Amino acid sequence: MLTFNQLIKNSRKKKNKFKNSILNRCPQKKGICLKVFTKSPKKPNSALRKVVKIRLSNNKEIIAYIPGEGYAIQEHNYALIKGGKVQDLPGIRYKIIRGALNVSGVKNRKSSRSKYGTKK
């Protein structure tokens, strides 16, 4: 136990809380797709972004973005998610990893293939 003078001299250091409690300091997490739907982005942009609701292996539910053109993900498929927000979709802080588990890669992709799970 510290005395009052010791506390004044060196105050207690706060532990930094990590923001991403859902991933729990893991780089990726596996989950089951519950629902696939579209969302519209923030003000200057206009599109229908494909998103999916996922129940993770720690029983928490999140909404993740499906990157790339076209997708072949359905309900009850397994998917691997990573952190990383989508700039024009508020509240979506996770992305699906294409080419892992039941999610197929982007077809006919020539550049940035590793990001979209496309083989050469």
Curated annotation (Swiss-Prot):
UniProt cross-references to InterPro entries, sorted A to Z: NA-bd_OB-fold, Ribosomal_uS12, Ribosomal_uS12_bac
Family annotation (CDD domains): Ribosomal_S12 (cd03368)
GO CC annotation: apicoplast; small ribosomal subunit
The UniProt record lists the keyword Cell wall biogenesis/degradation: no
Keywords tagged on the record: Apicoplast, Plastid, Ribonucleoprotein, Ribosomal protein, RNA-binding, rRNA-binding, tRNA-binding
GO MF assignments: rRNA binding; structural constituent of ribosome; tRNA binding
Location in the cell: Plastid, Apicoplast
Chief site of localization: plastid
Function: With S4 and S5 plays an important role in translational accuracy. Located at the interface of the 30S and 50S subunits.
Family to which this protein belongs: Belongs to the universal ribosomal protein uS12 family.
Designated name of the protein: Small ribosomal subunit protein uS12c
Species whose genome carries this gene: Eimeria tenella
Organism taxonomic ancestry: Eukaryota, Sar, Alveolata, Apicomplexa, Conoidasida
